[in-house]
């Protein structure tokens, strides 16, 4: 999913009526909140752990994070993990709306994806030498 699709998916997961966003620039109101939540969630996820080189896309690392700016920007992680960004964003968005059932759902889904991300992209610990 690209940046725009992630923001649209977040809106659906939040059970928000209406349409949009239709792009990620020049947004106001709720659409701006969804766009911002996705951008911030992706930056947070990149900074959560000391991910290994397989996690990072070309030219990106813990010191040079990928910022989503254009509608077509796509997070560098494999496609099957893109929805993790939505669930991470959903937690804070649901908190701001005092929607406890959505907070719980966001946390449960994010926990599943965090486990998968850690299993696949954290350096393997070693003992001794």
Task: Report the location of each language-model feature.
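Short conserved catalytic/interaction loops centered on acidic-Pro-aromatic/His motifs
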Residues: 97-108
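Exposed beta-sheet edge/beta-hairpin loop segments within beta-rich domains
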Residues: 75-80
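Generic hydrophobic/packing signal
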Residues: 10, 34, 90-93, 103
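Conserved short "hinge" loops at termini or chain/domain junctions
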Residues: 1-74, 108, 112-129
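Short, hydrophobic/amphipathic alpha-helical patches that form generic packing surfaces
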Residues: 83-95
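Extended aliphatic helical segments
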Residues: 24, 35, 83-86, 103
